[in-house]
């Protein structure tokens, strides 16, 4: 039975009911709805609506229902209830009779669903933070094991300067650390309870909303009832964090897809995260990574959709807000799945050090070192840049790396070049010289690994 039938003389059209009902997705708020109802029953005792005995009876029935839901959540979808609030109330009335009808006193589904959703968000943020930190830890471990794996660094997808696979891993640790910070920051703003704000104007019962917020694990209660029932900033913030986080994972996936190609050959992915072709027996496709990359788009879409849903809504609650859940649920589920999958990909990855080093020695990635060498000899950098460009053209013409050009040929481009140039052009020298904070030198990479390990515990 609907919770609002008294005003109406005709039953809802079945097509409208199917269009209007939300149980098929808000069933995921069942645990939060029950927990919120237990807290509300306690608040009703403080204002004399329920006796302590009645509250105890309601709480016992709600806790039984909670265990039942945890054991068999699919039962909810067997109902034709309008939403999760209707389902919980109906089940409660089945258990305790008329007493169950007293529970909704002073409460609206508007503040009820806002509370449920915030509780769900808090639970889910906790899961996301755990998965995020687990992926960071796997990246740090992978970096630790590959500090000596020299590979090309790229700009414009052209070989630029030598880096290490460890340095590449740590770049994504930095991105994930920012994602972690965004989640923690969003959690601070969503950690306020709207319960007790009623439909829009507040409850008529003198409930201590701060006490009620504490019972539910919130840091405090909201300060304005109109805002409280219509606020979905936390949905937007979490969708934004998810969108940014998925961009990071998509870039991670794209890098590894490229590194895994036959043309690059820097890594070998585990059989556990790849699949084959129904036609071509030799294929080993990076499906896990491609799906991470592909799923990024749906998360961006969820954020855009929610922005558009909210942009024109007047205060306070509107049924448009029912659209907040499906996109949020899907986006955060997707992000969580992709965090787990990225960690699984790294768990079995093999870095092909000889091939990485071979590629790093190609493409004149040490050209900047020659320019810096000239600067150290007193040549202005812009002039040094031009000189090295000419030397690279000659090396390309001869099909040689820079370090294989004889000294007399190098001196044609600048007489200040001496025998001491050759050690400077080695890969190890290229790495060692990048010793400023954040650089790719072995010392800086080791420090970055130690810092990340200490931060992650």
UniProtKB/Swiss-Prot annotation:
Its main location: cytoplasm. One of its GO terms (biological process) is L-arginine biosynthetic process. PROSITE patterns: FUMARATE_LYASES. Its EC number is 4.3.2.1. The keyword Ubl conjugation does not apply. Pfam families: ASL_C2, Lyase_1. Pathway: Amino-acid biosynthesis; L-arginine biosynthesis; L-arginine from L-ornithine and carbamoyl phosphate: step 3/3. Belongs to the lyase 1 family. Argininosuccinate lyase subfamily. This is Argininosuccinate lyase. Keywords: Amino-acid biosynthesis, Arginine biosynthesis, Cytoplasm, Lyase. It is found in: Cytoplasm. The keyword Lyase applies. It catalyses: 2-(N(omega)-L-arginino)succinate = fumarate + L-arginine. It is an enzyme of class 4 (lyase). GO terms for molecular function: argininosuccinate lyase activity. The gene is argH. GO terms for cellular component: cytosol.
